[in-house]
Amino acid sequence: MNHERILEKRETILQYCHRLTEMHRAALFDEEESPRNLSLQQLRKNIHICLKDLCRLNTWLTEQDGGFRKALGSLERYESKLAALLAKERQLGEERQAWEAAVPAGAGDDSGGVFTVHGGHQRHLNAYIESMGVDNTGLGKEPDALPRLSRQQALGHVAVLRLAQAAVSREISQAEGLLKSFRKDQTFIKAELAKLEAFVRAQKLAVERELEGVRRSQEHIFRKIGLLKLPAREREPLGLGRRPAADLESMKAQMEEFLHVRKSALKAMLSEHKQETQLLKSQQEVWKEVTTLVEDLEDRIRTRFATAAKVDPVELRRLITDAITQIKSLHYEESYPDVLTCIRDEIAALEKANDQLPFSKQKSITDKLVPVNTGAGFLVNSTSPPKVGLTKSIVPSSSMATNKKSV
């Protein structure tokens, strides 16, 4: 059972004890309001049971594996878990930031990839144009015009053009092979880029999911320690990739102070209830002694009336006075208010009973005394005296003695 449940039960018992105190007073002084279903002796016993139960609950709260120490241990464990979660959150935040980093410097520098193509056919072509003249070639105003050439000139130009044609064909073939290689490289680069970009997205998503799990764990602990009151289903969900709620961030800022206050409060309650346990044990003993003294008095009065035809009121006064003196000698001043009230009510009831006893200095007191009858009245007519053991249940039907004791 956790300390909150124990404290709730303790509060219930305290309220019941207060109600018993009121019933105890009514049973002692108020005949009309006296509880019908509980005797005075049972009320006294129930008050003692309440004190015993309170003592037991306090022991559960303060023992080595009790409620307060368990709560303190839980808070310390939660504090440790939260510290680990916050460290994990910082680490994941840094990791996410690293995945968002720009392309490293120099990655776009392509100066080392310059290709220089040398056109060997240009030499032959330039020689031909220079020999023929630009205007006498297809570059002139009349592309189809052909100057008068000697056989040697014509064959020479043909030879040069054939060399140029062979050279340019070779160079085109080389260029086409290079372009094909470039296109092949392009296809490979696209495939590799798509694969690696998918990998980066997956890694970033994994970091986000892990961050989400960390935040949910934090929220769970905040709810456990009482910093977050609303149940999870009533809170806005923290979706993947979304920023945490503002109140969750606020709770992180309050966490250290909140835990410090909670632990300080639990330690203070632990110390307070440990002291209270000793007080409760002492009060159990005091109340037990009080009820024992009162019930012993009742038994002695009952026995005296059962064994003597007449009883001197002076003897009764002495018995009651002795009981009052013994009760007052007990250390009960620091008792619970309800226990203190019950003890004082017992004393007041005894004193009232003592005051209502006639004095034996008179010549005869039998005229002022009546036999105990079937009613619940006290030994003096027309009174509703306290129930201190001098009612019909204790005193048999007999008369009080005169000045002279009759044994």
UniProtKB/Swiss-Prot annotation:
Q: How does it sit in the membrane?
A: Peripheral membrane protein
UniProt subcellular location:
Cytoplasm; Membrane
Keywords on this record? Autophagy, Coiled coil, Cytoplasm, Membrane, Protein transport, Transport
Q: Which GO terms describe its cellular component?
A: cytoplasm; membrane
Grouped into one coarse class, the protein's main location is: cytoplasm
GO biological process terms, semicolon-separated: autophagy; protein transport
Give the residues annotated as coiled coil. 74-101
- Superkingdom of origin: Eukaryota
Stated family: Belongs to the ATG23 family.
What does the UniProt record say this protein does?
Required for cytoplasm to vacuole transport (Cvt) vesicle formation and efficient autophagy. Plays a role in ATG protein retrieval from the pre-autophagosomal structure (PAS) and is especially required for autophagy-dependent cycling of ATG9. Also plays a role in regulation of filamentous growth.
What's the name of the protein?
Autophagy-related protein 23
Q: Which gene holds the coding sequence for this protein?
A: ATG23
